C-alpha cells in the first residue's frame, strides 16, 4: 500500500478505532471533529485519497459505508452487518411514523440489535426521565418495532389525546388505558383511547 500523509493517517486510525469499538464507521462530521477539520469537503477529499491508496472501501449509495481494508489481504475487513434505521423527530397524527417528513436522519445499528424485519424498525430519541427505573435514560435511543397492538406490561410508543408521542409501559384496564411511567415520582396517564405506534424492542446508548 502507498504511504499516507500525517492527516490521512490520523483519519485512517480514527476510522479503524471507531469500527473496532462500535462496530460501524463514523460519519464525515465525526471524522472532521476528531481530526480538527471543519470542512466536510476536505474530509471527503482525504477519504478519496485513502480509497485510492487502498486503505478503505466506500459505498456511495449508503451513509457511513466505509470499510477498512486489511493490509495483508487487501480485502475489506469483515465487521458486523450494519443497518440504517430512521430516527423519528416530530410524530404527527395521521401520518405513517416512517413518513419522510417525520425522519430526521438515519442511524447505523448492528443488525443483531433489531432481530426483526428491518423495514419495521425506527428509533426515537428519549427526552426526560419518566422511564429511568426501566433503565431508559434521558438521551438514550429506543429501538422500536412498528405495531398497533400491545400486551399488558409492554413498553410502547403511544400517541396521547394531545397528539404527543410518549414512551410508557402499557396496561389495558376495564374501562380505560393506563400508560405507566417507570419513575416512582411520576403519575400514570389514564386515557379512554390510545394509539399504539410501536413496541420498544431495544436500547442504544452512547458511552
Curated annotation (Swiss-Prot):
Keywords: Autocatalytic cleavage, DNA damage, DNA repair, DNA replication, DNA-binding, Hydrolase, Repressor, SOS response, Transcription, Transcription regulation. Its EC number is 3.4.21.88. It comes from the Bacteria. The active site is at residues 130, 168. It is an enzyme of class 3 (hydrolase). It catalyses: Hydrolysis of Ala-|-Gly bond in repressor LexA. One of its GO terms (molecular function) is DNA binding. Residues 28-48 bind DNA. The record marks 93-94 as: Cleavage. One of its GO terms (biological process) is SOS response. NCBIfam families: lexA. Belongs to the peptidase S24 family. Represses a number of genes involved in the response to DNA damage (SOS response), including recA and lexA. In the presence of single-stranded DNA, RecA interacts with LexA causing an autocatalytic cleavage which disrupts the DNA-binding part of LexA, leading to derepression of the SOS regulon and eventually DNA repair. Homodimer. This is LexA repressor. It comes from Staphylococcus haemolyticus (strain JCSC1435). The lineage of its organism: Bacteria, Bacillati, Bacillota, Bacilli, Bacillales. The gene is lexA.
Amino acid at each position: 500500500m502507498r504511504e499516507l500523509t500525517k492527516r490521512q493517517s490520523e483519519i485512517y486510525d480514527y476510522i479503524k478505532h471507531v469500527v473496532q469499538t462500535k462496530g460501524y464507521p463514523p460519519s464525515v462530521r465525526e471524522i472532521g471533529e476528531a481530526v480538527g477539520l471543519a470542512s466536510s469537503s476536505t474530509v471527503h477529499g482525504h477519504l478519496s485519497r485513502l480509497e485510492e491508496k487502498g486503505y478503505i472501501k466506500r459505498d456511495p449509495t449508503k451513509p457511513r459505508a466505509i470499510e477498512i481494508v486489511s493490509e495483508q489481504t487487501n480485502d475489506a475487513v469483515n465487521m458486523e452487518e450494519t443497518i440504517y434505521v430512521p430516527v423519528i423527530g416530530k410524530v404527527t397524527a395521521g401520518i405513517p411514523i416512517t413518513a419522510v417528513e417525520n425522519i430526521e436522519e438515519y442511524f447505523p445499528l448492528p443488525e443483531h440489535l433489531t432481530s426483526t424485519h428491518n423495514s419495521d424498525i425506527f428509533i426515537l430519541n428519549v427526552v426526560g426521565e419518566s422511564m429511568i427505573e426501566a433503565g431508559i435514560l434521558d438521551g438514550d435511543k429506543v429501538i422500536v418495532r412498528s405495531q398497533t397492538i400491545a400486551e399488558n406490561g409492554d413498553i410502547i410508543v403511544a400517541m396521547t389525546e394531545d397528539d404527543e408521542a410518549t414512551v410508557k409501559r402499557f396496561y389495558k384496564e376495564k374501562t380505560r388505558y393506563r400508560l405507566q411511567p417507570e419513575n416512582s415520582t411520576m403519575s400514570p396517564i389514564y386515557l379512554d383511547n390510545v394509539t399504539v405506534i410501536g413496541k420498544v424492542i431495544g436500547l442504544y446508548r452512547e458511552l
